[in-house]
Amino acid sequence: MKRFAALLVGVLIFAATAASAQDRYQSSPERRVVAEKDWGPWLGPFRAQLVPSLMRDFGERYLYAPANTALPAPRPGEQRVVFLGDSITDLWELARFFPGKPYVNRGIGSQVTAQMLLRFHQDVVALKPSAVVILAGVNDVHGFLQQETAAQIEANYEAMADIADRHHIRVVFGSILPVNNYTDNAKSMLEDRHPEELRAINRWLAAFCRERGYQYADYYSALVDDHRLLQRDLTTDGIHPLATGYARMAPIAAAAIARALRSHPRA
């Protein structure tokens, strides 16, 4: 009984000490508790499966780690280009649309700019490219994995560009693509991905590229319709381009890459 009482006193002292320590944290008041949103029959289970993994590796750096290790250094004179992005990049068949080019795909579906920033050193810098093509932001606006304001998205763009500059890697930013809600698969697409917000971020990104001397690949203008939405025949789900969409994007990317490679990298 005495042993139990001593143990109970010890627990109470520990709890009181922990509570007192908590009061001293600069981050007080306590962290917020967020109610989970109903993400629907497909995104809900996907998110439930994904979030525990992200708690261990938010940037998902493990996904390309084996491929990065196996990839040899660029040959003398080779101008390697890394495409960094989300599912729109992940689904882009670079060998098909850029035959013979030493282009490396490092897209990961559903990712946001904060995740790409976390893996930038591993998936871009370590591969020693001459240039990087960054296509990101549409998932940030959606808020599926990370709630980001436009200013926070822009800060992530800038941070990735700063890292590239530090390592003498030329930078190409792709505009966020338009989206649409024309089909049943896309009927809720505009609820969280507001077209006017996408356009505002693109305007900022284009101005940022002009200011820094980066190349801006304007996919948006090549894919948008008269309603300022993604052209109906270029997608089935309102967000991911079909091969016909990538066929329009490829020459825009190629021209931006060519301009970037002719320029001097920022120091």
Question: Where do the model's predicted regions map?
Answer:
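N-terminal secretory targeting modules
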Residues: 1-82, 90, 94, 127, ...
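Acidic/histidine-rich helix-loop elements
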Residues: 45-47, 51-58, 100-114, 142-148, ...
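Active-site metal-binding loops of divalent metal-dependent hydrolases
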Residues: 87, 108, 138-139
